[in-house]
């Protein structure tokens, strides 16, 4: 299974430009539990809301009681690919350099912070030349994420992007949409690669942590904490490359249990999938 958190992916752009990549798809939407990433990641991993797991910012630790039964405990093997969670890059701000274990004690098994490396891991999983296999690849994609939304990487910490906030504020709605769509198109290419590499045997679930403000409602750009009053920030897409009924109550809290259910249905109980896995792992 590939579980994809498409950071900052808006529902309207997803429906308009990403529908139809897979032969079969089922779509839905829900309201984000928060409109920035850290508490959403903790919620998806633990299946608990922020008031239970306690994450309010990127450097927080997760309440250990919320980590007794995480998403990853239901997979024999998994890897996480994320710019936030992977091996800490040198450009991390001071607030993060002493907190390289992202949202501990969640066991992410992060292997890289390079967004492009996901293709390598999916390719290695499905290549008959290797005996590597991961039951879950958790991919936190930044292809639709804009630097104007990363307020913790400010002028003092990253001078190279010190003018991004001002630049985005000065751009027109049309310009913002144009540049945002480039990221959406890149993400579409990646989804097509996942489909082709696995011959659509891999179950792929895509959802967003929050949307993105692009001056559709007032002058706001990017994303920020407490942005539920902006519809394009609060409404997020979710879809699966299977003909499936997505529950009406799906949200960031219930997502964990539904993902586990889909994994059991389409992979653990899928004879074709399990036969291929056995051949690979016997090598």
PLM region spans:
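Extended, charge-rich helix/loop segments that form flexible
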Residues: 81-92, 138-174
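Short loop segments at secondary-structure junctions
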Residues: 48-49, 241-246
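A short, structured beta-strand-centered segment in the mid-to-C-terminal lobe
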Residues: 247-253
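Histidine-centered active-site microenvironments of extracellular/periplasmic hydrolases
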Residues: 201-203, 207-243
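Active-site-proximal alpha/beta segments of enzymes that process anionic O-linked groups
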Residues: 3, 8-133, 142-148, 258-282
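Residue-level preference for the first positions of well-ordered beta-strands
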Residues: 1-2, 134-138, 203
């Amino acid at each position: 299974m590939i579980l994809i958190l498409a950071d900052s992916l808006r529902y309207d752009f997803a429906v308009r430009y990403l529908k139809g990549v897979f032969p079969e798809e089922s779509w839905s939407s829900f309201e984000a539990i928060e409109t920035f990433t850290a508490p959403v990641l903790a919620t998806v991993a633990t299946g608990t809301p922020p008031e239970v797991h306690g994450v309010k910012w990127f450097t927080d630790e997760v309440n250990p009681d919320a980590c007794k039964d995480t998403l990853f405990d239901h997979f024999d093997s998994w890897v996480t690919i994320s710019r936030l969670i992977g091996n800490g890059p040198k450009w991390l701000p001071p607030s993060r350099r002493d907190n390289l274990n992202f949202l501990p004690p969640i066991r992410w098994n992060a292997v890289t912070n390079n967004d492009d490396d996901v293709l390598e891991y999916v390719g290695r999983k499905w290549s008959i030349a290797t005996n590597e296999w991961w039951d879950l690849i958790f991919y936190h994609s930044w292809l639709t994420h804009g630097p104007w939304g990363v307020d913790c990487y400010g002028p003092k910490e990253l001078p190279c992007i010190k003018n991004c906030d001002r630049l985005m504020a000065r751009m027109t709605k049309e310009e913002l949409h144009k540049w945002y769509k480039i990221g959406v198109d890149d993400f579409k290419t990646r989804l097509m690669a996942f489909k082709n590499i696995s011959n659509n045997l891999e179950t792929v679930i895509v959802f967003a942590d929050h949307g993105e403000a692009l001056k559709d409602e007032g002058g706001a750009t990017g994303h920020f904490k407490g942005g539920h009053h902006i519809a394009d920030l609060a409404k997020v897409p979710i879809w699966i490359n299977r003909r499936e009924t997505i529950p009406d109550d799906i949200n960031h809290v219930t997502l964990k249990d539904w993902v586990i259910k889909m994994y059991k249905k389409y992979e653990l109980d899928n004879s074709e999938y399990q036969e291929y896995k056995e051949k690979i792992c016997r090598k």
